Amino acid sequence: INIFYHTAGNGSKEYVLECTRHYDTANMYAQGGWYGILANWAFGYGFIAGPESSSHFRFNATSGYSYFNPTKSLYEAYVAEEGVDGYRVSSWIRTFEQVVGMNIGINSTANRYGNEGYFRLKWLASLDDENVSYWCGNQSCTPVIRYADVLLMMAECCIQTNDPDADIYLNKVRTRAQLPSKSNVTMDDLKLERRLELAMEAVRFQDLIRWGDAPIVLADKGKKLPNFLIVPKEGNDLTTAKGIYNAQYDTSVSYTENERELAGWTPNRDELLPYPENEIEVNPNIVQNPGY
């Protein structure tokens, strides 16, 4: 599973449908590289390259904006189901302590807004994924549908129709994740498995809408904005490279209230996204979705 979202995974037998990419100097932004940069860690100002980490990740002033962070809730769900050393969580998420252990220095003066101390490893571009001739070129294909998604969709259908084969399909995913099998699986089992297996793959929102869970799960989403704070401990030597890479830190998370109207969940509006205004102007037959 470590090859997913990397060039090594291009054409994988687990990619049922994928968005392919190729080197095209005339369309670097359009082919998706820009979005990889937006979702990259804040390399360049938040993190500092070490002697080993620089051979795996791209560090420069414009290589990452640190969008798209895993939440504390997601990390804790992984740990509760498979432990801190679970196959999936250790492949797809890093804690701050683990980031420090990756031979990456920390710029403690940089704020990490929108972060609770957990960092996405899934879909994090490596040097092998980058087209080195241009800073945002990315040649790793994006899986639109993975085989695990298909198995879990089949399991969900079986649960809804009281078909005992639901166990078979769900356990195929759990077996690959190095977890014990379950029997007589329920919708709660299915919901958890989809959350963990397909985390950060842009299917969670649609799942919550389909299940009718969005008004509860997303009721307070975005109302409090996290800021991950890092303070070097006394005695650190931050004047040398060795000192930076071996520094120790105290960490905390603060939250600020977000009073924007769009924060949280508004019934009969948030189930759908708005049509872009220019699309409505071009086509008067389009009626804007409710609430916008």
State where each predicted segment sits.
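Extended, hydrophobic/aromatic-rich amphipathic alpha-helical segments that build helical scaffolds
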Residues: L17, G83-S91, C141-V173, M187-A199, ...
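Noncatalytic, helix-rich "gating/capping" subdomain that lines the substrate-entry/channel surface
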Residues: G46, E52, H56, S66-N69, ...
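Glycine/tryptophan-enriched, flexible segments
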Residues: T62-G64
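Short, compositionally biased low-complexity segments
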Residues: Y45, P51-S55, P164-N171
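Long, intrinsically disordered, low-complexity segments
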Residues: I3-A49, S53, G137, K182-Y292
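Flexible, polar/acidic helix-loop-strand segments at domain edges
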Residues: E14, N69-R146, G291-Y292
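Short alpha-helical segments and helix-capping/turn motifs at coil-helix boundaries
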Residues: I1-A8, K72-A77
